[in-house]
């Protein structure tokens, strides 16, 4: 069977809504508050696998998990000027408790720099306690005025992993930015999510940051989605909160901070990037169910019973080897109907067991990504399944990376850049002198969003000139249609 | 050394504040919103162990984890009349997004019956889908007017495990109530938390329930703390939300529900119940660190280095056997200062390693609960540590249960009941005719809180009469000073 990616690529938005609904990942559009949805059991397990992975990676680098209150008093949130400017139009405010008006408005946390810096004034006095690396996994809230989208642009971002670190020096915070980038790279590598890293332009960095490094990916419809950010905050918040620590030389000074976050969007990408017109394809790293067994009924009822027994035996072997496997025993559905739904759900392997498999003591295994099948003897079951899962994981990852790479273009002509972007180019790079003025001009002319300059793999622009001012280019500027 | 429980028992409130602060479990009273605190890294790990355990127990019984939005629109929350009456004075309301007034007020979830029942109208159509067992672990919010207390009475309850189930019949929901009770019993048994189960009186059941079974425990100060509740909701919410399903016989009817919850209070109890004047004592089931190694410096610096090396070797052996162990290498603190802080933190075992241990290839292990020590040869290290942890776990549990049992009294004299309660009796049972009128009279006369009638171990009251009306008693009524 030919696995097409027509709907996936050309009607992605519709495809995505269909998959998260039919695969029972995330219920969106029915809960009666705009921009808020429900993680369904299957989706919750995918989410949990991602959460477990990021915890493991952060803990291994000495991060400590904490849990702060949801509510931030207005005066705290207003303490750092740039920060509140960036967020104030998007804050949900609690103003009442019962029928009493509260003395001070309480914000649903849009992010936690202010709350955490405030508490650090109690916790940290000396450089000897530094660096400190905290993180929490919580909901954050934004009163988005843009069109909301399930898992991608929400008013309640229900899986926000935010890390907040504190350092004696600017340089140590910069080292932390690099550590955070390595952690996120490992995270995305493990999940098979391709990414590109850019330093956001001055006019699009995090409100309160010195600079922001962002991870972006390209969705099936060629639009770019930001999936992770790392900020060097310098002393902006420590000064605003008058947080001073004793330095090694005995003087008191404001320590330096970083913060970095990832969200639900990681799951949205994991579900999207490996998809086709049959549904999603989950990397085995995230898949709650690694293999689904579909018993193929025989004409003879007793034989069917034996097939079920045999299927249970196969499932037991796999489960006891740590490979979560379910049998779809529904007697009201045909095997074909079962294939349909489990393909939408993206279970990596399907194991078909019918009379032929029963009599030959074998199973027939189909990979979700290719739908190619092989017959496997029962005695080789575990080793073959492990091998297939690993091959599938690698193949998915390679395909996803190839897709991303195929969507990055270069031109030194601004008109052409605009045309490329209008015809789903993905990301277009143009040579740039690095001035804000030219950057803003490029953004305006192309009607695209500026992602910033390359952080990872800069192009050689030594012979190029800025597309606007024609002065020698210092780097490239990345442009895209974004979410 | 004699381990006293003076402060623990007689100044419990102060003891508790001291422990959670000094052990770095929960930062309370400094975050600038009343009734909200911060889970610190050490406390977060204790919390996580409890969360992992309840997840394991619920999943094993077919519960599915989901995640609902925080915000509940006012009209949804008002749908079930009794429910909103019980909660409305305690709801935090979001009324603004940015500077815009919202069309409808949004409640910070006080609990999720309404949100979940609403979504179930989309999800469930047929008895074939039943029973459904959902749960989520989230923050819930109550605008408490009573005095707030860390982890015990909060405005943000940041670890609320709420389960919500749906059933074809009243009887199946009743079966679920029993299943939930078994799950909670297993949970508390495993954590070594003693409990007593009561059916709450009519006037103190959950707002919207047919009946409520509660788990209570007795704190060191003899006051009773509710630590878990299980509610039979009948058709109250399904009727309010017009949720009908097709029954086996083809008719449409409102299904029956249960809900059950536990909270942060479980951690508060785990920290409190096994304590003494040196701090908390954590059951190995919850302890993030099972053993702490304190190297005792030698006079000779080289020997001290060898002691450190030897300590690292010991730690490595334990960690590789799944026993999380840390070495306190701080050179600015004396061993005595280290004992002090690790005792507050309640690490189950302390391993002292000095010149004597180094030369004899042994370690000296002290149990936190008794501070009794034994010398153990290195070759027996793992088996001895495992044995000690298990003995300590059992001993803690037994002591805690003995404490609870010693605090349950019986009298058929109301005056005496009042006296007992005023002199820290814990729980007092009196014979009761089971009428609301007499129950309320008992509550009024004693000035105590009525916990309800025994669910677990009812007394034989066949020869007794109600303390108020003198008619034959049907059961006992439990009274207590409560949190």
Swiss-Prot record, chains A, B:
Please indicate if the UniProt record lists Cytoplasm as a keyword: yes
Where it sits in the cell: the answer is: Cytoplasm
Drop me one GO molecular function for this one: proline-tRNA ligase activity
Keyword list, A-Z: Aminoacyl-tRNA synthetase, ATP-binding, Cytoplasm, Ligase, Nucleotide-binding, Protein biosynthesis
Which PROSITE patterns does the UniProt record give?
Answer: AA_TRNA_LIGASE_II (PS50862)
Q: Is Protein biosynthesis a UniProt keyword of this protein? A: yes
EC number(s): the record gives 6.1.1.15
Which InterPro entries does its entry note? aa-tRNA-synt_IIb, aa-tRNA-synth_II, aa-tRNA-synth_II/BPL/LPL, Anticodon-bd, Anticodon-bd_dom_sf, Pro-tRNA-ligase_IIa, Pro-tRNA-ligase_IIa_arc-type, Pro-tRNA_ligase_II_C
Q: Which Pfam families match?
A: HGTP_anticodon, ProRS-C_1, tRNA-synt_2b
Reactions performed catalytically: tRNA(Pro) + L-proline + ATP = L-prolyl-tRNA(Pro) + AMP + diphosphate
Q: Which GO terms describe its cellular component?
A: aminoacyl-tRNA synthetase multienzyme complex; cytoplasm
Q: Name one GO biological process term.
A: prolyl-tRNA aminoacylation
Q: What class of enzyme is it?
A: ligase
| Similarity remark | Belongs to the class-II aminoacyl-tRNA synthetase family. ProS type 3 subfamily.
| Function as written in the Swiss-Prot or TrEMBL entry | Catalyzes the attachment of proline to tRNA(Pro) in a two-step reaction: proline is first activated by ATP to form Pro-AMP and then transferred to the acceptor end of tRNA(Pro).
Mind telling me which HAMAP family this protein's record contains? Pro_tRNA_synth_type3
Entry comment, domain topic: Consists of three domains: the N-terminal catalytic domain, the anticodon-binding domain and the C-terminal extension.
Subunit (UniProt) = Homodimer.
The family database entries (NCBIfam families) matched by this protein are listed as: proS_fam_I
Task: Please report the name of this protein according to its UniProt entry.
Answer: Proline--tRNA ligase
> Which organism was this protein described from?
Sulfolobus acidocaldarius (strain ATCC 33909 / DSM 639 / JCM 8929 / NBRC 15157 / NCIMB 11770)
């Amino acid at each position: 069977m030919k696995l097409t990616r027509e709907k996936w690529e050309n009607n992605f938005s519709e495809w995505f809504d269909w998959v998260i609904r039919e695969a029972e990942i995330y219920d969106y559009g029915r809960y009666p508050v705009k921009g808020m949805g429900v993680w369904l059991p299957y989706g919750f397990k995918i989410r949990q696998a991602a959460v477990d992975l990021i915890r493991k990676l952060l803990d291994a680098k000495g991060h400590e998990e904490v849990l702060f209150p949801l509510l931030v008093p207005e005066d705290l949130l207003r303490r750092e000027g740039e920060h509140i400017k960036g967020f104030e139009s998007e804050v949900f405010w609690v103003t009442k408790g019962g029928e009493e008006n509260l003395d001070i408005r309480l914000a649903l946390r849009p992010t936690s720099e202010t709350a955490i810096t405030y508490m650090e004034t109690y916790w940290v006095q000396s450089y000897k306690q530094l660096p400190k690396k905290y993180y929490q996994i919580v909901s954050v809230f934004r009163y988005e005025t843009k069109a909301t989208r399930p898992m991608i642009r929400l008013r309640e971002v229900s899986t926000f992993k935010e890390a907040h670190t504190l350092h004696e020096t600017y340089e140590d915070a910069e080292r932390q930015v690099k550590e955070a980038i390595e952690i996120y790279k490992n995270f995305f590598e493990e999940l098979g999510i391709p990414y590109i890293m850019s330093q956001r332009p001055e006019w699009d960095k995090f409100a309160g940051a010195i600079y922001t490094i962002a991870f972006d990916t390209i969705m099936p419809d060629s639009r770019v989605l930001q999936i992770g950010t790392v900020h060097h905050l310098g002393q902006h918040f420590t000064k605003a909160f008058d947080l001073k620590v004793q330095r090694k030389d005995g003087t008191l000074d404001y320590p330096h901070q970083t913060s970095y976050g990832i969200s639900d969007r990681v799951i949205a990408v994991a579900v999207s990037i490996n998809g086709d017109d049959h549904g999603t394809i989950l990397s085995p790293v995230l898949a709650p169910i690694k293999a689904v067994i579909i018993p193929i009924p025989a004409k003879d009822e007793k034989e069917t019973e034996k097939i079920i027994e045999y299927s249970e035996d196969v499932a037991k072997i796999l489960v006891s080897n740590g490979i979560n496997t379910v049998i779809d025993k529904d007697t009201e559905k045909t095997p074909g109907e079962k294939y349909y739904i489990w393909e939408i759900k993206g279970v990596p392997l399907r194991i078909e067991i019918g009379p032929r498999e029963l009599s030959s003591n074998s199973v027939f295994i189909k990979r979700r990504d290719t739908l190619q099948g092989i017959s496997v003897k029962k005695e080789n079951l575990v080793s073959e399944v492990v091998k297939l899962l690993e091959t599938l994981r690698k193949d998915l990852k390679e395909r996803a990376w190839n897709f991303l790479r195929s969507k990055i273009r270069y031109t030194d002509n601004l008109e052409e850049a605009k045309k490329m972007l209008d015809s789903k180019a993905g990301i277009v790079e143009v040579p740039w002198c690095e001035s804000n003025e030219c950057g803003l001009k490029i953004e305006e002319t192309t009607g695209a969003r500026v992602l910033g300059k390359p952080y990872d793999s800069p192009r050689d622009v030594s012979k190029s000139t800025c597309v606007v001012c024609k002065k020698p280019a210092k780097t490239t500027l990345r442009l895209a249609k974004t979410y």
